[in-house]
């Protein structure tokens, strides 16, 4: 009798676990909408107004799947994947670095790099990170980003005007501040993400004839990657 009771109890527990797992699976999948997690203020990638190119990609996916796109917005800072995709708040991240082991990556759809950006009107002739003219220039860089290792390598940190790495993009956009300082002459050259730099320069009326972008190359000199591939993450 005791063995029958134990067997029955075990069966009930297994059935209960199966129901719960199926309920969890149902909650994790929304067949009525394409749930997208994105940064609320990270142009040119995404924002709450749907103005970024990642928003456009999400719209295209929704159109192809014939379902509406709904967003869960969260700043793309430390904990981004943990607080979005891992908590089943969305089905997909439109833009994430290839090789991120917290997600399953799609085939990359974009390659971008960090680089050096300056205005041509200022007579700057820099074409590489060890150019001697850099020793006399004011350099803008976001603290903790890969270009800081390049600047350390060439003993240029004494010329740096640093910008915070950790911030709330809903209150301040560091990339925009860096470009504004470049235009206002507070810095002579900035080391930053190419897509962000070009977006804010052109937003402020500076076309390709007015600025120079020099990509930083990934090398074997111990300063990490300077170029990245972007994928979607699921």
Q: How should each PLM-predicted stretch be described?
A:
Residues 1-80, 86, 98, 123-127, ...:
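N-terminal hydrophobic or amphipathic helices and topogenic motifs
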Residues 27, 83-84, 133, 150, ...:
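Well-formed, non-transmembrane alpha-helical positions, independent of function
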Residues 32, 88, 155-158, 185:
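Short glycine-centered helix-capping/turn motifs at secondary-structure transition points
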Residues 35, 40-63, 115-174, 195-196:
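Bilobed "Venus flytrap"/periplasmic-binding protein-like clamshell domains
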Residues 59, 63-64, 68-133, 209-226:
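Acidic, polar ligand-binding/catalytic clefts
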Residues 71-91, 170-199, 203-204:
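Short helices/loops that flank or line small-molecule/ion binding pockets
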